[in-house]
Amino acid sequence: MNKYVVILAAGKGTRMKSQLYKVLHKVCGKTMVEHVVNAAKGTNPDKIITVVGNGADSVKDVLAGQSDFAFQEQQLGTGDAVLAASDLLENLDGSTLVATGDTPLFTAETFNNLFKKHEESGNSATVLTAKAPNPFGYGRIIRDEDGNVLRIVEQKDGTPEELAVDEINTGVFCFDNKELFKALKQVGNDNAQGEYYLTDVLEIMRKAGHKVGAYEMPDFSESLGVNDRIALAQATKIMQRRINEEHMKNGVSFIDPDTAYIDSDVKIGNDTVIEGNVVIKGNTEIGSDCYITNSSRIVDSKIGNHVTITSSTLQEAQMDDNTDIGPNSHLRPKAVIRKGAHIGNFVEIKKAEIGENSKVGHLTYVGDATLGKDINIGCGTIFSNYDGVKKFHTNVGDHSFIGAGATIIAPVNIADHSFVAADSTITKDVARYDMAIARGRQTNKPDYWHKLPLSKDKEWE
C-alpha cells in the first residue's frame, strides 16, 4: 500500500508574537516542522507534502530536498489546507496521514502505529487520539458501542456527559486518500469562523457508510501543539528529556539531566560524563570516556575520545583524543587541537592548529597559526595576526619553546627546535636551533630609591 504524509504549515502563528514564521521556531536545535518531517520520514512514505502559505520561501529553504510543497493562498481552515495538496495527491491510491507542522513531539513510531491501525482496521478515516490528564479545550472523541468514532465534539459544543470524556483529538488523521479528497469537496464553511474544517470529513465519510475509527496513542505529551512561547518552552523541555534519556540508555552519564541542553542531532559516546549547565548544539560529535564540566558550551564541534572540557566554549572546533581544555577558554571556528595537546585557562584559539602533545597553558591568543608537536607556549603569548586590513599566518615548528609574554607578529616562521625568549616581540623568521631575543636590555640605577621625592614618605619605607 502506498503511503503519503501531508504536513500543514501555512498558519501565521500570531500568538508567537514573532517575525519568524511559527513552524520555523526551533526545539532542541531543529525547527518544529523539521521534527514533524523527520517523524514522517520514519514511516517510509512515497511522498511528503508540506502545505505552506505565510513564509513559504523560508519553509521551502529549510525543507529543501525533504518534501514536496503545496501552496494555500488564503488561510481558510485545515480542510482547505489539505485540499491545496489535491494536484499532487487526489487521484492516487493509498493512505494519507495528515499532521500539523507545529507539533514537534510526534515520533515515527506513533505515525507508523497510526498507519498500521488504519490499514488493519479497514477504516476510511482513523483519528489519532490520546487520554488527556486535563481534556479542557480539546475536541472529545465520541465513540459508538463498537468503538467506532461517531463524532468529535468541541469544548464549546459538548454536553456534560460528552465533556466528561478524556479521550481527545490530537489533530492527526489517517485517511483513504481518494475518499479524503472526495469528502473534502463536500466540506462547507457554515460556521462562526467561515473556515473549512478537516474534522468535517469524518462525519461526511460516516454518513456515506465508510468506517471511521481511532488509534489511541499511549503518550499524551506527543500531541502538544505549539502556539505561543509558553508551549514552545514546554515542548523543548519534553524533547530535551527524551534526548537525554536516550543518551543515558546508550551509556552517557548526566550529573543533572534537567540542566543539560543537548540538541537532537548531537552524538555522544558511551562512558562520557556531562555535568549540569552544559549546552551542546548543532552537529556536535563527542567520543567515549570524555568529561564535560559545568558551564561548557559546545557548538558544531568534533570531540575525540578521552577528552576533558572544563567550563569552556567550543564553536566549529576539533579536539582529538586525549586532549583537554579549560577552564574559561575559547576555541573559535577552525581551531584544531591534535592528540595529547593541552589547552589551559583563559586561552583563545581561532583558525589555528595545535600539534600533538603541545601545551598552551594560560592567558594566550593563537590566531591564524600552525603549531607543530611538542611545543610549549608560555603564559601571556600573543599571536598578532592582523594589520588592520589583512590576516597573516604564523608557523611554529616541532619541539619549539616560546617564552612567557612573547608577541609573534605574523607573518613569520619559527623553525623546529628553536626558542623565543620571554617578553620578545618577534617580527622575523627564527632558524632551526636558534634562540630569538627581541627586547631591551635591563639597566639597573644604583641607589635610585633615595633620589625619589617619595623616598622620605614613611608609608614607602
Curated annotation (Swiss-Prot):
<feature type="binding site">
    <location>
        <position position="332"/>
    </location>
    <ligand>
        <name>UDP-N-acetyl-alpha-D-glucosamine</name>
    </ligand>
</feature>
<dbReference type="GO" id="GO:0006048">
    <property type="term" value="P:UDP-N-acetylglucosamine biosynthetic process"/>
</dbReference>
<feature type="binding site">
    <location>
        <position position="439"/>
    </location>
    <ligand>
        <name>acetyl-CoA</name>
    </ligand>
</feature>
<feature type="binding site">
    <location>
        <begin position="77"/>
        <end position="78"/>
    </location>
    <ligand>
        <name>UDP-N-acetyl-alpha-D-glucosamine</name>
    </ligand>
</feature>
<feature type="region of interest" description="Linker">
    <location>
        <begin position="230"/>
        <end position="250"/>
    </location>
</feature>
<feature type="region of interest" description="Pyrophosphorylase">
    <location>
        <begin position="1"/>
        <end position="229"/>
    </location>
</feature>
<dbReference type="GO" id="GO:0008360">
    <property type="term" value="P:regulation of cell shape"/>
</dbReference>
<dbReference type="GO" id="GO:0000287">
    <property type="term" value="F:magnesium ion binding"/>
</dbReference>
<keyword id="KW-0573">Peptidoglycan synthesis</keyword>
<dbReference type="InterPro" id="IPR005882">
    <property type="entry name" value="Bifunctional_GlmU"/>
</dbReference>
<dbReference type="GO" id="GO:0009252">
    <property type="term" value="P:peptidoglycan biosynthetic process"/>
</dbReference>
<feature type="binding site">
    <location>
        <position position="169"/>
    </location>
    <ligand>
        <name>UDP-N-acetyl-alpha-D-glucosamine</name>
    </ligand>
</feature>
<protein>
    <recommendedName>
        <fullName>Bifunctional protein GlmU</fullName>
        <ecNumber>2.7.7.23</ecNumber>
        <ecNumber>2.3.1.157</ecNumber>
    </recommendedName>
</protein>
<dbReference type="GO" id="GO:0071555">
    <property type="term" value="P:cell wall organization"/>
</dbReference>
<keyword id="KW-0133">Cell shape</keyword>
<dbReference type="GO" id="GO:0005737">
    <property type="term" value="C:cytoplasm"/>
</dbReference>
<dbReference type="InterPro" id="IPR018357">
    <property type="entry name" value="Hexapep_transf_CS"/>
</dbReference>
<feature type="binding site">
    <location>
        <position position="376"/>
    </location>
    <ligand>
        <name>UDP-N-acetyl-alpha-D-glucosamine</name>
    </ligand>
</feature>
<keyword id="KW-0460">Magnesium</keyword>
<feature type="binding site">
    <location>
        <begin position="385"/>
        <end position="386"/>
    </location>
    <ligand>
        <name>acetyl-CoA</name>
    </ligand>
</feature>
<dbReference type="GO" id="GO:0009245">
    <property type="term" value="P:lipid A biosynthetic process"/>
</dbReference>
<feature type="binding site">
    <location>
        <position position="139"/>
    </location>
    <ligand>
        <name>UDP-N-acetyl-alpha-D-glucosamine</name>
    </ligand>
</feature>
<dbReference type="InterPro" id="IPR038009">
    <property type="entry name" value="GlmU_C_LbH"/>
</dbReference>
<feature type="binding site">
    <location>
        <position position="350"/>
    </location>
    <ligand>
        <name>UDP-N-acetyl-alpha-D-glucosamine</name>
    </ligand>
</feature>
<dbReference type="InterPro" id="IPR029044">
    <property type="entry name" value="Nucleotide-diphossugar_trans"/>
</dbReference>
<keyword id="KW-0808">Transferase</keyword>
<feature type="binding site">
    <location>
        <position position="154"/>
    </location>
    <ligand>
        <name>UDP-N-acetyl-alpha-D-glucosamine</name>
    </ligand>
</feature>
<dbReference type="GO" id="GO:0003977">
    <property type="term" value="F:UDP-N-acetylglucosamine diphosphorylase activity"/>
</dbReference>
<dbReference type="InterPro" id="IPR005835">
    <property type="entry name" value="NTP_transferase_dom"/>
</dbReference>
<comment type="pathway">
    <text>Nucleotide-sugar biosynthesis; UDP-N-acetyl-alpha-D-glucosamine biosynthesis; N-acetyl-alpha-D-glucosamine 1-phosphate from alpha-D-glucosamine 6-phosphate (route II): step 2/2.</text>
</comment>
<feature type="binding site">
    <location>
        <position position="227"/>
    </location>
    <ligand>
        <name>UDP-N-acetyl-alpha-D-glucosamine</name>
    </ligand>
</feature>
<dbReference type="GO" id="GO:0016020">
    <property type="term" value="C:membrane"/>
</dbReference>
<keyword id="KW-0548">Nucleotidyltransferase</keyword>
<dbReference type="InterPro" id="IPR001451">
    <property type="entry name" value="Hexapep"/>
</dbReference>
<feature type="binding site">
    <location>
        <position position="72"/>
    </location>
    <ligand>
        <name>UDP-N-acetyl-alpha-D-glucosamine</name>
    </ligand>
</feature>
<keyword id="KW-0012">Acyltransferase</keyword>
<feature type="active site" description="Proton acceptor">
    <location>
        <position position="362"/>
    </location>
</feature>
<feature type="binding site">
    <location>
        <position position="22"/>
    </location>
    <ligand>
        <name>UDP-N-acetyl-alpha-D-glucosamine</name>
    </ligand>
</feature>
<dbReference type="Pfam" id="PF00483">
    <property type="entry name" value="NTP_transferase"/>
</dbReference>
<keyword id="KW-0511">Multifunctional enzyme</keyword>
<keyword id="KW-0677">Repeat</keyword>
<dbReference type="GO" id="GO:0019134">
    <property type="term" value="F:glucosamine-1-phosphate N-acetyltransferase activity"/>
</dbReference>
